[in-house]
Amino acid sequence: MARAGAPEVIRAAQKDEYYLGGLRSAAGEALHSLAGAKKWLEWRKEIELLSDIAYFGLTTIAGYQTLGEEYVGIIQVDPSQQRVPSRLRRAALVALHAVLPYLLDKALLPLEQELQADGDAPRASQGSLLPGGRSRSGARRWVRHHAATLTEQQRKALQRAVFILRQGFACLHRLHVAWFYIHGTFYHLAKRLAGITYLRTRRLPGEDQKARTSYGLLGLISLLHLVLSMGLRLYSFRQKQRARKEWRLHRNLSHRRSSLEDRAVCRTPLCTLCLEERRHSTATPCGHLFCWECITEWCNTKTECPLCREKFPPQKLVYLRHYR
């Protein structure tokens, strides 16, 4: 048996992804019909993980070919390429392929959201952005508690590190796929880490050196596209950081300006009748202050305080000299 080429490995992966998509969809629809849309939104990632584990548990871990591998006629072998992988190696493959990405996303996504919040919005409102109120989970509360203790410099450094990690994993995956197109050995990064390759049991019609050359050219194009997209993402990240910094500066200046205006308004006594600066302050028997012109005109129609409605004759008004 010869080593499987890139066309067989890609066809097998696409076929497995097709059946995995159907299994995930069926499991999600079952949960949606039994528990409702809210629970489905809350647990859809876990449902996808359980579907992947069930699929690979019944095939790879059990020692059978997956439906995609059976479709193209390839089998898994260990680094010696003479024996099928041990059960432990196959279990490690499934853990690296299905469980590890879920755990990384579960850890990095809440941390990135808390760091991006940066105190700009009330903490209680952040949970509304998450489906099913997942912000109440213990992991998110732990992340929120420790993120609140960070200084501004530590928060910026950690936010930059989380961004680099998330983008780095995505770029590493794309780089690995491009390298596979060129060399045609490991399509999934998990298989490279587990040391599992493929041998083909039959030769597919139409495979020749021209197809391998085409995949090599595709790999070079993918590498070029990866470099360009990495540059654009880095530029976009710097632009967002600059815009966020300018917005915080503008917000602080606006808050400071509004505070100064409020203080100035508080220092200027206002008449509650004309809503302007109080002139010739006059006191009613109940102790409220108004402009002399405003309160005398008021008393011509109503002999009561405009605020507390206490009755009093106009001659009880007291003009306050040298009082603002």
From Swiss-Prot:
| Keywords linked to the UniProt accession | Membrane, Metal-binding, Peroxisome, Peroxisome biogenesis, Protein transport, Transferase, Transmembrane, Transmembrane helix, Transport, Ubl conjugation pathway, Zinc, Zinc-finger
Which residues are involved in binding Zn(2+) 1? C271, C274, C291, C294
Ranges of Low complexity composition bias in the record: 125-136
| Pathway assigned to this chain's UniProt record | Protein modification; protein ubiquitination
Please give the activity regulation comment for this entry: The E3 ubiquitin-protein ligase activity is stimulated by PEX12.
Which parts of the sequence are annotated with region: Disordered?
119-139
Catalysed reactions listed for this entry: S-ubiquitinyl-[E2 ubiquitin-conjugating enzyme]-L-cysteine + [acceptor protein]-L-lysine = [E2 ubiquitin-conjugating enzyme]-L-cysteine + N(6)-ubiquitinyl-[acceptor protein]-L-lysine
> Peroxisomal matrix compartment: which residues?
1-5, 59-87, 184-214
Q: Could you list which ranges are Cytoplasmic topological domains? A: 36, 121-145, 235-324
Q: Which GO terms describe its cellular component?
A: peroxisomal membrane; peroxisome
> Which molecular function GO terms apply here?
ubiquitin protein ligase activity; zinc ion binding
Specify the domain of life of the species encoding this protein.
Eukaryota
Single GO biological process annotation from the record: cellular response to reactive oxygen species
Membrane topology of this protein? Multi-pass membrane protein
Q: What class of enzyme is it?
A: transferase
Binding positions for Zn(2+) 2? C286, H288, C305, C308
> Assembly and interactions?
Component of the PEX2-PEX10-PEX12 retrotranslocation channel, composed of PEX2, PEX10 and PEX12. Interacts with PEX19.
Know the name of this protein? Answer: Peroxisome biogenesis factor 10
Q: Which organism is it from?
A: Mus musculus
